[in-house]
């Protein structure tokens, strides 16, 4: 993982883009651009590089085999002590064109007492609701200023939800300022198996 280059960042087209907003609410609007809207809460500074709208492609693996997908991830805030997260994915055909909608998740990043060391460290807490019918709780730590590792701590499934094991995720800012990640999930044999990976470019923020 790499440290962001502030000078290069200011030259990106994304610096002038942000989320569309309605102007009639008496509350701060969500912003995915740190140059606009409320200041980022001090409690979230360790996650500052994640804020933005990210778009790109990745590779996935399911019971039918390997596939490619497109993805947009929106990481925003309203000045509160959490970040909002919305990730939408769509499967691509052999020509790289849209084929069908696939995974979608929404949730919140925040910091909480580390369940493994409550007296010493603050852990990243990521709560995700998946469109496939399950809710997942991750805990993790920053590895450095631009990478973060999380592991599933608890998983609850609806009666119609997908049968799925826990996961390990690694996110990081890589060369060029892109957001890259790898997700492994517990497979049928009880071990972690490759599930998703992607490299996304900053579209806004």
UniProtKB/Swiss-Prot annotation:
Transmembrane segments: none annotated. Its cofactor is heme b. Residues 1-23 are annotated as: Disordered. The keyword Metal-binding applies. Its EC number is 5.99.-.-. Homodimer. Belongs to the nitrobindin family. HAMAP family: nitrobindin (MF_01297). Forms a 10-stranded antiparallel beta-barrel structure able to accommodate a hydrophobic ligand in its interior. In fact, this fold hosts the heme group, which is located in a wide surface cleft. This is Peroxynitrite isomerase. It comes from Mycobacteroides abscessus (strain ATCC 19977 / DSM 44196 / CCUG 20993 / CIP 104536 / JCM 13569 / NCTC 13031 / TMC 1543 / L948).
């Amino acid at each position: 993982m790499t440290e962001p280059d502030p000078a290069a960042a200011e030259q990106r087209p994304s610096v002038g883009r942000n989320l569309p907003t309605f102007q009639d609410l008496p509350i701060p609007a969500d912003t995915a651009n740190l140059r606009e809207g409320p200041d980022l809460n001090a409690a979230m500074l360790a996650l500052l590089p994640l804020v933005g709208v990210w778009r790109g492609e990745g590779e996935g693996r399911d019971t039918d085999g390997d596939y490619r997908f497109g993805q947009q991830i929106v990481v925003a805030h309203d000045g509160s002590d959490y970040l909002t997260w919305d990730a939408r994915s769509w499967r691509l055909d052999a020509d790289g064109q849209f084929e069908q909608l696939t995974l979608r998740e929404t949730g919140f990043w925040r910091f909480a007492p580390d369940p493994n060391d409550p007296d010493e460290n603050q852990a990243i807490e990521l709560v995700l609701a998946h469109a496939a019918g399950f809710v997942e709780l991750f805990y993790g730590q920053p590895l450095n200023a631009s990478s973060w590792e999380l592991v599933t701590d608890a998983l609850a499934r609806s009666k119609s939800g997908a049968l799925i094991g826990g996961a390990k995720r690694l996110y990081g800012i890589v060369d060029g300022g892109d957001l890259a990640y790898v997700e492994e999930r517990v497979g049928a044999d009880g071990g972690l198996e490759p599930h998703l990976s992607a490299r996304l470019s900053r579209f806004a923020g």
